[in-house]
Structures are given as structure tokens and as C-alpha cells.
Curated annotation (Swiss-Prot):
GO molecular function list: mRNA binding; structural constituent of ribosome
Organism of origin: Tolumonas auensis (strain DSM 9187 / NBRC 110442 / TA 4)
Subunit structure: Part of the 50S ribosomal subunit.
Matching Gene3D superfamilies: Ribosomal protein L13 (3.90.1180.10)
Function comment: This protein is one of the early assembly proteins of the 50S ribosomal subunit, although it is not seen to bind rRNA by itself. It is important during the early stages of 50S assembly.
InterPro entries named in the record: Ribosomal_uL13, Ribosomal_uL13_bac-type, Ribosomal_uL13_CS, Ribosomal_uL13_sf
Keywords of this entry: Ribonucleoprotein, Ribosomal protein
Biological-process GO terms, alphabetical: negative regulation of translation; translation
Protein family membership: Belongs to the universal ribosomal protein uL13 family.
Pfam annotation, one family: Ribosomal_L13
Gene Ontology CC: cytosolic large ribosomal subunit
Domain of life: Bacteria
Protein name (database record): Large ribosomal subunit protein uL13
Length: 142
């Protein structure tokens, strides 16, 4: 019996919507990353994008434990001398709440073209409204 290898053109991708209200950042991000990779499917193949589309709503209401809200710092570097910028979790969740979950999930996906393709299937929205109703996403309880 031969090992099954999924083909990119035959992979069936479903759409799911996840409500992030009151959820812990890391626990939610690990489950989303696993679903984006397709590890929950029987036909998972490491070098093929077999994951589903995930729409996350209420990203502004995501939580972290302990004092991480004040202590967790996100860095960005422009490439120029003195171009290192930092922002704490508290300030970033007010300014760009979608970015927090995207950064967390991005670190859990493979690095390279396949990981970037998986990350494109993640849609994060700060509020309850999203514009993917035409895809009829199923509610995913995490």
C-alpha cells in the first residue's frame, strides 16, 4: 500500500468563523494555525496546503493572562540606524487589534512560500462584522 499524497487541485477547503471574544491569545492562535495547515484532516500532507479558511471576529476582545497586557512588546525594524520601534500589547490592541492575532499565528506557521499561502487564508476582523457571508462559513467553537 502506498502513502497517500494530497494534490493541491483536489483539496477541499471549508470556511469557518471563530469568535475570539474572551479567548486567550496563544490557545486560540495554536488551534487556528493547526487548522490553516490542515493538520486536522486525514489527507494532511506537509508540503501541500491542505488547510481551511478561517475568519476571526471580535479580535479586539482577545485576552492575555498575567501582566502580559502591559509587558508584552512587539518590535518592528525599518532597516535604518535608530529605526527600531516598539509597542506594547495594550497600545496595539487599541490601534490595530487584527495585527495581534496575525503575528501570533504567523509565528506558528512554516516559514517560506507555503506558510505565506497558509497565512493568506486567515481573515481577522476587529468587530463582529465580516464580508465573507457569501462563503457561508460554519461556526467553529474553539
Amino acid at each position: 500500500m502506498k502513502t497517500f499524497v494530497a494534490k493541491p487541485e483536489t483539496v477541499k477547503r471549508d470556511w469557518y468563523v471563530v469568535d475570539a471574544e474572551g479567548k486567550t491569545l496563544g490557545r486560540l492562535a495554536t488551534e487556528i494555525a493547526s487548522r490553516l495547515r490542515g493538520k486536522h484532516k486525514a489527507e494532511f500532507t506537509p508540503h501541500v496546503d491542505t488547510g481551511d479558511y478561517i475568519v476571526v471576529i471580535n479580535a479586539e476582545k482577545i485576552t492575555v493572562t498575567g501582566n502580559k497586557a502591559a509587558a508584552k512588546t512587539y518590535y518592528s525594524y525599518s532597516g535604518f540606524p535608530g529605526g527600531l520601534k516598539s509597542i506594547t500589547f495594550d497600545k496595539l490592541i487599541v490601534r490595530k487589534p487584527e495585527m495581534i492575532l496575525e503575528i501570533a499565528v504567523k509565528g506558528m506557521l512554516p516559514k517560506g512560500p507555503l506558510g505565506r499561502a497558509m497565512l493568506r487564508k486567515l481573515k481577522v476582523y476587529a468587530g463582529t462584522e465580516h464580508n465573507h457571508a457569501a462563503q457561508q462559513p460554519q461556526v467553529l467553537d474553539i
